[in-house]
């Protein structure tokens, strides 16, 4: 058996259905299908939507990196009653915000899925599936609406842990007296004024739930009733849900309350990207174990931005120093561990954590191999920008100035004032200027013959040098990556 075969373990995923970490076994060897619930397109997407997109983009990237042929489907729900309140033709509104969402995903460096179906394009298939559900005795039509009978689904509630006798139908909306069971849900809704509708055997109407792979993913809030309903209706039509593994990412919270449009406590991707580079937002969204809640925090965004900025000059330094030194045994060991962590995800976390403590090792040598390893990690994590690093740094510095409420001329003026204070040995004033700028997230660094500035986390005392060391950054992002697959609740 080759060394590669010895090192490569089974891929392990946490399955929401069983609440266990399970060895992943594809339906078809070498091929994987992933279905992820996308947005309801009627407004700009917030960072809660972004977390789901980034989480499953990470999975998609990693599976492709392992060599799997991946079919990745992420849908658009472009048929919804929310659109009618926006003063625009519903499908025009949906089309516009589908395109805006794709621009947001490009900014976050989320790869395009292989398929992006829209509900409105698949009405014929949806109608056929509803007919099959009714034919199998699991659905019934009432006055143009079609409902699913949850009493016909013995396993209803298994995914979310909800017991049918404990579900609180009518908690948010009045119970429809036409239902045989208050928990029955709509497969199709009769047409209403101002909403798009399509002809069907039950009259004009639209789907109540989009009708759907080997892996099915989405936000934790979709477990019930959305994904429960998907399972029930698919089993009713096809005798099997067709899904073996259910993955759910945690909520993004604001002051520990789930971020959402109904509470108006959300920030859109566009709002954050106006002040931070989108890759800093991506880094932030991967900073917690993917199934855990992630609380929105300006300080955490600042830290992610700082880490992203710090990485760039180190990579430039590595590229510039290629071949100048011999590779140390310690550097070789670090490279090996990083590569193994990326390629074979079940590598021992405890061993990596022990290595993380060795951050004082000299800046890595034999830099061709190190840069290759780092680029490999960053590419899978979606943090390898297509911009030149000069362009990236320029963009991040401009956003730092925006957050600080300053122009670059003002910063340069403060640097000149500090230089004059140092020449006159007024070190108290010199330190005060540096401190005031640091308070605004502007860190001054003295280099031979000059003083330069860079973005930094405000209100924290900057460390010497360029902030996070390369080793620390590599291990930080590897731990983020491992967390997607490993950690349970």
Curated annotation (Swiss-Prot):
**Which organism's genome codes for this protein?**
Arabidopsis thaliana (Mouse-ear cress)
Q: Which family does it belong to?
A: Belongs to the class-I aminoacyl-tRNA synthetase family.
The cofactor named in the record is: Zn(2+)
Keywords from the UniProt entry: Aminoacyl-tRNA synthetase, ATP-binding, Cytoplasm, Ligase, Metal-binding, Nucleotide-binding, Protein biosynthesis, Zinc
Cofactor, free-text remark: Binds 1 zinc ion per subunit.
Q: What SUPFAM superfamilies does the database record attribute to this sequence?
A: Anticodon-binding domain of a subclass of class I aminoacyl-tRNA synthetases, Nucleotidylyl transferase
- Name the Gene Ontology molecular function terms of this record: ATP binding; cysteine-tRNA ligase activity; metal ion binding
What is the name of the protein in this document?
Cysteine--tRNA ligase 1, cytoplasmic
Family matches, as HAMAP family: Cys_tRNA_synth
Instruction: Please give the CDD domains that the UniProt record associates with this protein.
Output: CysRS_core (cd00672)
Give the UniProt record's GO annotations in the biological process aspect.
Answer: cysteinyl-tRNA aminoacylation
Q: What is its main location?
A: cytoplasm
Query: Motif span ('KMSKS' region)?
Result: 258-262
Q: Which GO terms describe its cellular component?
A: cytosol
Q: Which InterPro entries match?
A: Cys-tRNA-ligase, Cys-tRNA/MSH_ligase, Rossmann-like_a/b/a_fold, tRNA-synt_1_cat_dom, tRNAsynth_Ia_anticodon-bd
Catalytically driven reaction(s): tRNA(Cys) + L-cysteine + ATP = L-cysteinyl-tRNA(Cys) + AMP + diphosphate
Which superkingdom does the taxonomy of this entry point to? Eukaryota
Q: Give the Enzyme Commission number.
A: 6.1.1.16
State where ATP binds.
261
Compartments (UniProt record) = Cytoplasm, Cytosol
Q: Where is this motif: 'HIGH' region?
A: 39-49
- One Pfam family per UniProt: tRNA-synt_1e
Annotated positions binding Zn(2+): 37, 226, 230
């Amino acid at each position: 058996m080759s060394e590669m075969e010895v090192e490569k373990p089974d891929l392990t995923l946490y399955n929401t259905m069983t609440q266990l970490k399970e060895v992943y076994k594809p339906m078809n060897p070498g091929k994987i299908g992933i279905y992820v619930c996308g947005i309801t397109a009627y407004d700009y997407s917030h960072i809660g939507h972004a977390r789901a997109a980034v989480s499953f983009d990470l999975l998609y990237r990693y599976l492709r990196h392992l060599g799997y042929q991946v079919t990745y489907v992420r849908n658009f729900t472009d048929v919804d009653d929310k659109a009618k309140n926006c003063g625009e033709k519903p499908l025009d509104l949906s089309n516009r915000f589908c395109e805006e969402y794709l621009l947001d995903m490009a900014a976050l460096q989320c790869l395009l899925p292989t398929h992006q179906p829209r509900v409105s394009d698949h009405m014929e298939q949806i109608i056929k599936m509803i007919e099959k559900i009714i034919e199998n005795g699991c659905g019934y039509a009432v006055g143009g609406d079609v409902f699913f009978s949850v009493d016909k689904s013995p396993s209803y509630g298994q995914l979310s842990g909800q017991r049918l006798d404990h579900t609180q139908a009518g908690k948010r909306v009045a119970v429809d007296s036409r239902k045989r069971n208050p928990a029955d849900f709509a497969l199709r809704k009769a047409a209403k004024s101002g909403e798009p509708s399509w002809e069907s055997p039950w009259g004009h109407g639209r789907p109540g739930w989009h009708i759907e792979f080997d892996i099915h993913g989405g936000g934790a809030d979709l477990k019930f009733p959305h994904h429960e309903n998907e399972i029930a209706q698919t089993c009713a039509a096809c005798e099997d849900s067709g899904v073996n593994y259910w993955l759910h990412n945690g909520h993004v919270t604001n002051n520990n309350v789930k971020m959402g449009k109904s509470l108006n406590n959300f920030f859109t991707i566009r709002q954050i990207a106006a002040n931070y580079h989108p890759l800093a937002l991506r880094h932030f969204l991967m900073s917690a174990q993917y199934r855990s809640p992630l609380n929105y925090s300006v300080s955490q965004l600042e830290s992610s931005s700082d880490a992203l900025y710090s990485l760039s000059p180190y990579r430039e330094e590595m590229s510039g120093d290629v071949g100048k030194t011999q590779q140390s045994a310690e550097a070789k060991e670090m490279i090996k561990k990083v590569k193994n962590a990326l390629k074979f995800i079940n590598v021992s976390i405890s061993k990596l954590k022990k290595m993380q403590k060795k951050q004082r090792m000299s800046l890595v040598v034999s830099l061709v191999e190190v840069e290759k390893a780092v680029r490999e990690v960053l590419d899978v994590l979606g943090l390898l920008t297509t911009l030149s690093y000069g362009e990236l740094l320029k963009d991040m510095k401009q956003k730092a100035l925006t957050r600080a409420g300053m122009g670059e001329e003002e910063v340069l003026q403060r640097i000149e004032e500090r230089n004059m204070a140092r020449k006159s040995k007024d070190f108290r004033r010199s330190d005060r200027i540096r401190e005031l700028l640091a308070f605004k997230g502007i860190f001054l660094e003295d280099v031979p013959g000059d003083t330069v500035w860079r973005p930094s986390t405000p209100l924290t005392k900057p460390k010497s040098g360029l902030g996070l060391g390369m080793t620390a950054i590599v291990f930080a992002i590897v731990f983020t990556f491992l967390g997607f697959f490993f950690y349970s609740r």
